[in-house]
A protein has these predicted regions:
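C-terminal catalytic lobe of FAD-dependent flavoproteins
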Residues: 183-219, 223-276, 354-398
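Feature captures the FAD/FMN-dependent oxidoreductase FAD-binding
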Residues: 1-49, 214-216, 222-235
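FAD-site-proximal beta/loop scaffold in flavoenzymes
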Residues: 51-69, 73, 77-84, 224, ...
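C-terminal, flexible cofactor-proximal segment of oxidoreductases
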Residues: 289-398
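Short hydrophobic core segments
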Residues: 26-35, 96-98, 255-265
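Glycine-rich dinucleotide-binding loop and its adjacent helix/turn
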Residues: 39-133, 283-291
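Dinucleotide-binding/catalytic capping subdomain of oxidoreductase cores
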Residues: 51, 105, 109-251, 326-328, ...
Length: 398
């Protein structure tokens, strides 16, 4: 980002400040890398009750996304999400997290930690203040398959067992492997390591800690119970049938719950005038080249989750980007991408509309402001979560 040949345009809304067609006319090629912006639903009764939320909403809030931390001059309706999340954190004892990926683990970890254990993070002040009043004592993590099929990494899993004053509870019976699970563990080193960690926890006596994280494998929610607000979750036991599908097998339980967080995957969203396959939640492509109107677009490319779906880690995104950039460079070499002298076209268009994009100097001023605020609190950094304070920091000279 610091190279002279790279320009950063922050605070520019594609589709509002500038259309896709105008952007394409201002540059030689466009790479779409805007990720998967929404979550997958559970599709069960009670999912709309107060207290049933998406992990994406909760993570955006505690990570300081300004879209979830509106300024006071924004319409009241835009503030409901943050206000509701804060109310849930400070009034819930029992939380149920549905999913067994790294996001689900992160949610469980954040919900169960004390504010002192979160004080070395870069959370915004108002988020830390909310967690100082956190009342959650029990987190239940549900996985519809067995431990061999979890999607988290061992490092993130093991950290849960190192949180002070927290017992991690695992039923040893859930860790018994059927032939298909055994095959997965034998072929997947991460799954094998995760199983060892879970077995250690299952064998470890409880310490009488004041908080608990309980894993429920082979379990899925069938109904969220409550009148105006979540009060419990019905779960059923599951198994994998002969066709490899997860099916119910009877039995189950009712878990007390004040908060239900679904973390069963993300899904891409369409942006105005960008090709989108609603059946997959992705931009259609061929080796990173966007498919538009049934053919390969001559100047549009795609990478990341909006290209392949919400899977993998940073390393996966790197190899994914290599494929896209390789296609772009090949097209430039072969003349499929027409290069023109367009220097300044985008700047002139934005200036004509009175739009002042934030460049890298502005980004550095925001960075400095967050470091300064963090230092004043004895922390490395404190996130600025409101758009107004971000823009103020961006404009402020050192």
């Amino acid at each position: 980002m610091e190279k002279s040949c790279v320009s950063f345009y922050g605070d520019v809304n594609i589709g509002a400040d500038i259309s896709i067609d105008e952007l394409r006319e201002s540059v030689d090629a466009v790479i779409y890398a805007y990720g998967a912006g929404t979550d997958k639903r559970l599709g069960i009764p009670g999912e709309e009750l107060k207290g049933s939320i998406a992990a994406a909403e909760l993570v955006a809030w505690y990570c300081g996304n300004p879209d979830v931390h509106p300024d006071t001059d924004q319409p009241a309706g835009d503030r409901l999400m943050a206000a509701d999340l804060q109310e849930l954190i400070t009034s819930s004892r029992h939380a149920v997290v549905v999913g067994v990926g790294n996001v689900a683990l992160d949610v469980a970890r954040i919900l169960i930690k004390s504010v002192d254990q979160l004080s070395d993070t870069d959370m915004a002040d108002e988020v830390l203040d909310c967690f100082s009043r956190n009342t959650v004592t029990d987190v239940h993590v549900l996985g519809r398959r067995g431990p061999a099929y979890t999607a988290f990494t061992t490092k993130e899993l093991r950290e849960l067992g190192q949180i002070a004053d927290v017992d991690v509870i695992v039923d040893a019976a859930d860790l018994e492997l059927d032939p298909s699970s055994q095959a997965v563990v034998e072929q997947n080193k991460v799954a094998a390591r995760n199983l060892v960690v879970l077995q250690e926890w299952a064998a470890r006596p409880l310490s009488g800690a004041s908080k608990r994280i309980t894993f429920h494998f082979w379990s899925r929610p069938t109904m969220i119970i409550g009148d105006d607000r979540v009060t419990a979750v019905e779960i059923e036991r599951t198994m994998i049938d002969s066709n490899g599908y997860v099916v119910g097998r009877g039995g189950g339980a009712t878990l007390p719950a004040d908060l239900v967080v679904r973390s069963v995957g993300y899904r891409g969203l369409p942006l105005v005038d960008i090709p989108f396959d609603d059946s997959t939640g992705r931009v259609p492509h061929a080796e990173g080249r966007v498919i538009r109107d049934g053919g390969v677009s001559p100047d549009e490319y795609v990478t990341g989750w909006i290209k392949r779906g919400p899977t993998g880690v940073i390393g996966t995104n790197k190899s994914d980007a290599v494929e896209t950039v390789t296609s772009l460079l090949a097209d430039v070499r072969d003349g499929a991408v027409k290069t023109h002298s367009r220097s300044g076209d985008l700047d002139r268009l934005l200036a004509q509309r009175g739009i002042r994009p934030l460049g890298m100097p502005a980004w550095h001023r925001i960075d400095a402001a967050e470091l300064k605020l963090g230092a004043s609190h004895g922390r490395l950094r404190t996130t600025l979560a409101h758009r107004g304070e971000l823009l103020e920091a961006a404009e402020k000279e050192a």
